[in-house]
């Protein structure tokens, strides 16, 4: 649903609250990190999350954008969590990066599906990575045997096996 995607994109520009001095949305989102103070990143993120969750339309628009994929992957009998969350990664800022992980490691149901909606074209380290199934089995075995103590070491061990997803705006 292109109109819902545009609505979400415009919502974020307004929620961010920084004057858009760029000629288009893609340039705005690709350069917003230049206007952010990394030490205030979590406060910035929480402010946007609060705006998202205060919006009467955001969840509906988000669902409309993702509905074709959600229906295909999990069917049409779904429940959406009450609160939408947001992750922000800043270029060259290790403190904002998400380490190699599975949401189930922190108690999330293995039956939950997470939707990532890119507001710009993403590739390489601007994207998200996945680990092929055969390597995932190896990773699970290593974790089960407690051979690696933290996600940083886990990342180093599997870095060469990661597949970075190329994904376009709204895909």
Predicted regions span which residues?
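Amphipathic, alpha-helical segments enriched in basic
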Residues: 37, 41-45, 75, 90-94, ...
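A short coil-to-beta-strand element that immediately follows conserved catalytic motifs
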Residues: 76-85
